[in-house]
Amino acid sequence: AAGKSVGLRINPQRSTQDGHEIYDPCAPGSRLGTTRAQWNAAVAANPALPNLLDGLHFHTLCEQDSDALATTLDAVAQKFGDLLPRMQWLNFGGGHHITRPGYDIAMLERCITRAQQDWGVTVYLEPGEACALNAGYLLTRVLDVVQNGDTTIAILDTSAACHMPDVIEMPYRPPLLGAGEPGEKACTVRLAGPTCLAGDIIGDYSFDAVPAVGDLLVFGDMAIYTTCKNNTFNGMPLPAIYARRPDGTTREITTFGYSNFKHRVGK
């Protein structure tokens, strides 16, 4: 359409993922991005196709440093370097952990400069979780504590499946204020949700003493991939959202009730 800039997502077929396969667009058989073989076949069928494009886009990173970007850019140059001089822009996608301590900013700058100098393109980076890395808390209370053999299990009023699905999907173990790794402190406890999903498990943590019913637990790094992915499976309520001021006081942003659940599934 007139006034629109058209781009194509490409698949450089160079995987840099380690432990995040669910977020790896370069995995074999991926549905995300056009491979060079697919591009060649499409152009053979429609030679005018390259003239329709203003830019190329790849999004292959997930919580990674710029060395993974450099590796990806090498693959892009190898697979698609001949196409880029005719493009106006190149989008590096997201997944850059720019705000993480130790992130190699200089390497990122070299990658951007390389693309600008080699192909004359404008370079874009998409905002990602680095914008809110290590921000946000999820507060939960202990509903029950049970013992199954040697395993102590605390049932919480939050759910991995409903409120932090990446814990199961990636998987990963979210940080918990004041807790240690399994076996680090006196009591190791498995924290789990109350849903019917047997695998609704947040992880194993150690404490100085087993948490009691009613105790408040605070998970960190919860601002990303939580509110946008949460759900009401088993009728689990959605967490209320509060803003914490610098002086420690809080302000209610929004709360959720039955009407929110009802409107999501019908009138």
Describe the role of every protein-language-model region.
Residues I10-P12, G94, A160:
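Short, small-residue-rich loop/turn micro-motifs
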Residues A1-W89, P101, C111-R114:
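Active-site-proximal beta-alpha core segment in soluble small-molecule metabolic enzymes
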Residues K4, G120-V121:
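A short helix->loop->beta-strand "cap" motif at the edges of active sites that frequently abuts
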Residues T34, L56, G94-H96, E129, ...:
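Gly/Ser/Thr-rich helix-start
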Residues C111, T122-K267:
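Charged (often Lys/Glu-rich) extended helix/loop segments that serve as interaction or gating elements
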Residues T34-A37, D67, T71, A75, ...:
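Conserved active-site and cofactor/substrate-binding residues in soluble primary-metabolism enzymes
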Residues T60-L61, L90-T99, P127-A130:
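Glycine-rich beta-strand-to-loop/alpha-helix junction loops that act as flexible
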Residues G7, N91, V123-L125:
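A structural signal for short, well-ordered beta-strand segments and their strand-loop junctions
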